[in-house]
Amino acid sequence: KILLNADLGEAVAYFTEASLSGESSIIKPKQVEPQSDDFWKWRMHMAEQLASQLEPSRFGIKGIYVMGSTVNGTAGPCSDLDLLVHFTGSTEQRENLMLWFEGWSLSLAEMNYLRTGYETGGLLDVHLITDDDIAARTSYAVKIDAVTDPARPLQMKSRVF
């Protein structure tokens, strides 16, 4: 067996009896019961945290919104987190933005698994819209300033001068 301590940067190895199954003895988390029915509140909080770390000029974003079951208060333990992003950047900014969201999505999915015991493989469902989409009221753009089932705007990171 090898025991690692990343904080100290040290490892110890020692011999043990071979396991019969040939598999490592990785301890998997036990099945957990969902903590409560506040799934939408947790998702809203995490959407706000995500948005607060998002730099508009770096990624070419005019706005970010949360929508769907999180806004409606009906999200369950397996629900995704729907984000609507008003994007005006370059192709490179788009690629970087989607990678940034992928990192958040996988991290949030792991946190959700530890809270609920449900695996999702990714928690974010990101929809990009453009100025043209908003002008034509196409796609998800109709959610912005909608009378029924509107997308809720999120505060992004402020520019520091």
Indicate where each model-derived feature is located:
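Catalytic core of pol beta-like nucleotidyltransferases
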Residues: 2-65, 71-78, 87-161
